[in-house]
Amino acid sequence: MSTMSARDNEKGSARSQPSHAAASEIENVPRPSRQQSWTGTMIKVFIICACAGIVSKYIIPLDSIFKSVHIDPHDYATRANRILSTTPLIDGHNDLPYLIRLETKNKIYDHEKLPFRTGLLSHTDQIKIQEGKLGGQFWSVFVECATDPNAEIDDPTWAVRDTLEQIDVTKRLVQEYPDLLEYCESASCAKAAFKRGKVGSFLGIEGGHQIGNSLASLRQVYDLGVRYITVTHNCDNAFATAASTVAVGKPDLGLTDFGREFVKEMNRLGMLVDLSHVSHQTMRDILSVTKAPVMFSHSSSYALSKHLRNVPDDVLNGVTKNGGVVMVTFVPSFLKVDDPASATIHDAVDHILHVAKVAGWDHVGIGSDFDGTADVPEGLENVSKYPRLIELLLERGVTDEQARKLIGENILRVWSNVEEIAENIRALGEKPNEETWSGRKWTAAIDIPMPFMFKDSADKRKEL
């Protein structure tokens, strides 16, 4: 509390005392009524609210202001930075969780053994993510196909267990770095995470073998947060033929009847159907039956590089009609099948431009396959190199609007459409699909005494 001297007090008192005449005049000034005070207050509130509305409309969306700032069109680095700062670059495929499985047995909390913040030798860590301005990532919760090439589709494996472990470690990794990563299960969350300065993190399964060729397992992994499944990896399954099968001279049988049920159930759930790794006939078959847009999480152009993992032009045209997206990958053997060692960032640019030319700029994206390939093209050594890729595209005449579609707007649109279609399907009352693969072997412990539900159950149990 402050103090005043007696002199100051007297001066203050003298200054504060009005003359009798002045006091009389003050007393005679009409005071505002309660209604007038209320009206004045409301006017002030209205003005404040109006100003707040103007601020929220014109000042808060800083990304809109940033987008409108004039930049020299030949300053490609600044243009690329603006694009990446205002639109999330969402990569369709990254295998970091599999490296964690292989090298740490999914132990992530010892930051000295897994220096994710300070730098890994592989393609992805916090420093590289921030330098590359990554805005969202589909993390692959991949586990491999059966190692025995003669294994039957329904032979028991550990694939489902291992997939659950990969879902677990990926979620825990995201939780361990909340200042950088944010777990998401929807397109709207991906957008919101980017606005909060976080890298939206989503789950994708790489092959139907990982769910045991089961629609019941499909529903369970959806409930666990998985938002896309690659129909096959490098092995056939109960759903379809893989590209790798055709590569060794076996017939391309395309999508099976059960595979059609699989796609139907994915549409009902709102799961993105991923066509990377499948055979060319499987691509065409799925496009003919799906009710929702599809994605290729990490594939390139077959016209430029005759690798069976790539997408032919007729399929690109089909993707246009379907409304889907082809996310171009950086795997050297896919970019230049005849000379992978010479592949560079410029080859990736060529593939992006070809997909855009054939399918349209609304149907192309980026799916690097970082940490899923030992070799990478010169200039695309790791996640930090995205800005340079965008610069080169701008140098080749790509507009800012086209670049925004490429890096994130297209996959977000496709994802949102898949979610909306699923809501409409479920609103019509379609129930979960109960079909099972025709070659499924059911087992029963018939030696354990159990009651029967039906008269003929004894014979049926013996048939299991």
Curated annotation (Swiss-Prot):
- What membrane topology term does the record carry? Single-pass membrane protein
Q: Where does Zn(2+) 2 bind?
A: E206, H277, H298
Q: Which reaction does it catalyse?
A: an L-aminoacyl-L-amino acid + H2O = 2 an L-alpha-amino acid
**Domain of life of the organism in this record?**
Eukaryota
Q: Per the record, what is one GO cellular component?
A: membrane
* UniProt EC number: 3.4.13.19
Q: What are the alphabetically sorted keywords of the record?
A: Dipeptidase, Disulfide bond, Glycoprotein, Hydrolase, Membrane, Metal-binding, Metalloprotease, Protease, Transmembrane, Transmembrane helix, Zinc
Name the segments for region: Disordered. Answer: 1-34
Residues involved in substrate binding = H233, R309, D369
Gene Ontology biological process terms, A to Z:
proteolysis
Against InterPro entries, the record matches this protein to: Dipep_AS (IPR000180), Metal_Hydrolase (IPR032466), Pept_M19 (IPR008257)
Per UniProt, Zn(2+) 1 binds at: H93, D95, E206
Cofactor or coenzyme needed: Zn(2+)
- Keyword Methyltransferase appears in the UniProt entry: no
Q: Which PANTHER family match?
A: DIPEPTIDASE (PTHR10443:SF12), MICROSOMAL DIPEPTIDASE (PTHR10443)
The record's similarity note reads:
Belongs to the metallo-dependent hydrolases superfamily. Peptidase M19 family.
Protein name (database record): Putative dipeptidase CPC735_014430
